[in-house]
Amino acid sequence: MDIEIMIPSDEPVRLLSAVTEELNYEKLTATYSQLGRNEYPPRLLFKVVLYGCCRGIYATREIERACRENVNFMYLLEGQRPPDHNTIARFRKEHLPYAVEELLDQMVKLLMQNGEISFEQSAVFIDGTKIEANANRYSFVWKTAVTNRQRKLGEKIAEELPKRLEASGTGIHAPCIITVRRLKKLRKGLYAKKKEQNITFVKGKGHHKPGLQKAIESITKWLKKLKRYNLDIHICGDRNSYSKTDVDATFMHMKEDHMKNGQLKPGYNVNVATVSEYIIGNYISADRTDTKTFIPFLNKLCNIHPVQRVVVDSGYESEENYRYVDGSEQLSLFVKPSNHEQKKKRKYKNDIGRRETMAYDAEKDEYTCAQGQKLREVTVKKRKSETGYIRETSVYECADCKDCPVKEKCIRQKKTDKTPLEDRVKRLYVSKYFIQQREAMEKKISTDEGILLRVNRSIQAEGVFAMIKEDMNFRRFLTRGKVNIMAEWYLVSMAYNVLKLHHKIQTGRLGNHLFALDAA
């Protein structure tokens, strides 16, 4: 029976097969052993797994069943017998992670050659979302808790170890600094004393343990805990937490909070870059905010593609990101300031304590509050971020806030503040460079070009996640470990590009790079 006649000419599987035939699989083939012949060509397995993503089929057993029952999957196998789920699982875990990113780059270049992706006529739209990891929700390890337990254990060892050594009668003294290495060396010395004195260790009820045995057992127990704590802190690295069942996953707040209690779940922060409605790159990190992911992601994109205009939402706004783009002649940034919508509200405009509502004299470099008092610069503070960026903040202080009738409205008083409100003076913490960049960005995004790109960011960047989560039914990773989940996400990205290309062909929108404002 000829399977091909059963598949309509406009079916996405035909387009997928045609696009994937244009790709080079040398890097994927190189992951296999050169001895003998592969049971299934890597090209066919890649097609099958990719089409499974297009149809929302991700589990290997479901893909195996589809290869036996679905005509479209049979068409991709080109007469080969259906692979079993173990073959598909090995392909995804042992081979695909080493080549899938390069395959996406090939697909992007193919779309560029056919005029579907244009960095000149479109822009790079970046957005992020959090995808839940395939890990137990209550398998958390908190770095702060481990650090506290490590400190308390160190105090306990420092207190009890000298007593244990004295009771052992060996004459060995406790080290000044407690470390795993020194405890091992100490235990080795105690075992030598045991052999020298021919002491027999006992166990069970009715036996009195000698002091040497108690000392060795205590040190062994402490060593086990110390090693565990050191390993936990090492796994956490720069993160504050990790999951025991997927050590690369970090606990984050997810958008899907059905219990409405702010529950933390293990997951990954997935950032996606789109151009002309197609995904051109991905960046997966453990950062819970998008601010820190901007620079490494943009560096990665600029090394591969001719990036020019970059459009992001307010979650990416920071002084460090402004400085990075400002130092590049190639890049032009469009970012909506985080207070863009907030400052339109009446409450914001009537807040006399805000810097934005105070008059500023640029020549004298001073602010004037609602009561006519002057706030002048008294010092400049420098603060180093986790990434090493040094931010300069000017501190402006009012000379006299005594007996001010609007002091409660002007100065925000927290419950944790030790200084009473009567003794406090108004201070403003101002980053001059950040304010300068933000004001310039407000003008930039209000131009016709800025409005067009902001509207398209909402459609193209956020539309990617809408389609992947709803239409492609991808809401949670199936695999574990950053290498595996990256391969999984890159597959989903390529499947999205195929479906997007098919949709543009069917709707006659080939060659369109931006949505017009009237169409949006």
Per-segment meaning from a language model:
Residues 49, 56-69, 80-520:
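Anion-binding and metal-coordination hotspots
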